[in-house]
Amino acid sequence: MPRKKPFSVKQKKKQLQDKRERKRGLQDGLRSSSNSRSGSRERREEQTDTSDGESVTHHIRRLNQQPSQGLGPRGYDPNRYRLHFERDSREEVERRKRAAREQVLQPVSAEVLELDIREVYQPGSVLDFPRRPPWSYEMSKEQLMSQEERSFQEYLGKIHGAYTSEKLSYFEHNLETWRQLWRVLEMSDIVLLITDIRHPVVNFPPALYEYVTGELGLALVLVLNKVDLAPPALVVAWKHYFHQCYPQLHIVLFTSFPRDTRTPQEPGGVLKKNRRRGKGWTRALGPEQLLRACEAITVGKVDLSSWREKIARDVAGASWGNVSGEEEEEEDGPAVLVEQLTDSAMEPTGPSRERYKDGVVTIGCIGFPNVGKSSLINGLVGRKVVSVSRTPGHTRYFQTYFLTPSVKLCDCPGLIFPSLLPRQLQVLAGIYPIAQIQEPYTSVGYLASRIPVQALLHLRHPEAEDPSAEHPWCAWDICEAWAEKRGYKTAKAARNDVYRAANSLLRLAVDGRLSLCFYPPGYSEQRGTWESHPETAELVLSQGRVGPAGDEEEEEEEELSSSCEEEGEEDRDADEEGEGDEDTPTSDPGSCLTARNPYALLGEDEC
């Protein structure tokens, strides 16, 4: 055994300093993470297992990973359907932080908000989704799974070989979640693709449309959800855009909380927060449109009269509740059969499955995380039967719901398809869990360059001595100003907690309280045409007919700055489940509003 060498106090001190530097990743001398809790968050992430032994990408980040010592008593793995994204390198994260500190924000023109689906997904390229490889009944389960894993790795290899990580968006790297999509498509007679009306192009992969309508020969219904969050003219413009690009689509406008047309609205105004008491699922706008679309698709092959009768009962019950001033209990109404399929039920079926078997139409619900799939199912049922959350990836396993004896709904976990979208836009779309973001500042800058965040929140520049003087803003300045206004401080040094402030701003955007809507190509030039379009007036009237009566709802309004106090506590933890908060906009002095409660839906925690 070699003789021990003396180790001085000075050497020990130097050793500890070097160890801290390595853990914090501060070899370049940048200590930006010391101003917030992001440093400790990133250090914890470095200690987790982030590699996938067989994956083409060497760094996979498993979001919302739960500690588990093995399978549960029923063989359930809590991490089976977790979101798997490619991890950003530390160099890339630090580069974005420097840009957030140095890059001066400039407002963009309205044309920049126009999104063309051909630029986002590039139809015909390798930006496809994984298909289930050919199989036969002679194959064992192990052989089938091994073949699927090899095919999936080849799929990832093609994408990462054609595009660099900087160009690619976040997309799902978890094969188990894609298997859920395969099963839903195999079971379904009709496929619903749910999108968020604020950015429907983000949630509409053309490869899925071609596969469903072409290879499978199924009808695809595009649901433009949350239409209460966008101006009616923009909703109509998006509807016509998709009809023109994809003529085989059946398009349905949907929202679980229609707005009242008696109050005007201006997108991007200062918002207030409402607290709804009771439930409002029976006031959903869109179930009847979806019924008509399914009737046109089935052409009498399935008896949907029970569904029509249910919609009539829901409308009558909502009207009766408004007159009496009472709300129904969640347990009232006919029972809804809920099934959670096991692995044996998830095994593939034959390619020639019988359509409308036993007189039942199976409707598969597919969409990105946070587009409102679970809220849509609750709106169709008429009460809460599905747990909802604003955390992406909340729906973790395959479930079926019998809406009526002849109508079955299949809920698929949210899937992120590969695209060329900016990752900052994906964060603002609610695709990436905000509590898990390593670097939120560039997303705040992306938002602030498209809507006047500083003016809406009445922020004062951190370096401004004279409030009336003009100062250039960067993303870091906005976060620091919001932290100062909200009182977000670090634990020991009491510095402004910019990381927490950035998370808070992103939550306001995802919840719809800072409204950012994107436009179809050419909308800026034709805005007046769409505002005077007959369908725009019809949409306003339809929302007014089913919208809530203001005299029957008890609301507690709070100013934006004070209502964020509760959110400050939520920022410390991961997003919570539950329902109850709704947001109502109010404008700055002199601005004009067009709708009451246009941000109501995002008060419900979305999945």
From Swiss-Prot:
Protein residues bound to GTP: 225-228, 367-374, 411-415
Modified residues (Phosphoserine): S32, S33, S34, S51, S68, S324, S561, S562, S563
The entry's keywords: GTP-binding, Nucleotide-binding, Phosphoprotein
Biased composition (Acidic residues): 550-585
CDD domains assigned to the protein according to its UniProt record, in alphabetical order: HSR1_MMR1
One GO molecular-function entry: GTPase activity
Residue(s) carrying Phosphothreonine: T48, T50
Biased composition (Basic and acidic residues): 15-26
GO BP terms: DNA damage response
Pfam families: MMR_HSR1 (PF01926)
Top-level taxon of the source organism: Eukaryota
Residue ranges with Basic residues bias: 1-14
Domain CP-type G: residue ranges: 178-418
Region of interest (Disordered), residue spans: 1-81, 544-607
Domain notes: In contrast to other GTP-binding proteins, this family is characterized by a circular permutation of the GTPase motifs described by a G4-G1-G3 pattern.
Function, as annotated: Possible regulatory or functional link with the histocompatibility cluster.
Membership in a protein family: Belongs to the TRAFAC class YlqF/YawG GTPase family.
Protein name, UniProt field: Guanine nucleotide-binding protein-like 1
The encoding gene: Gnl1
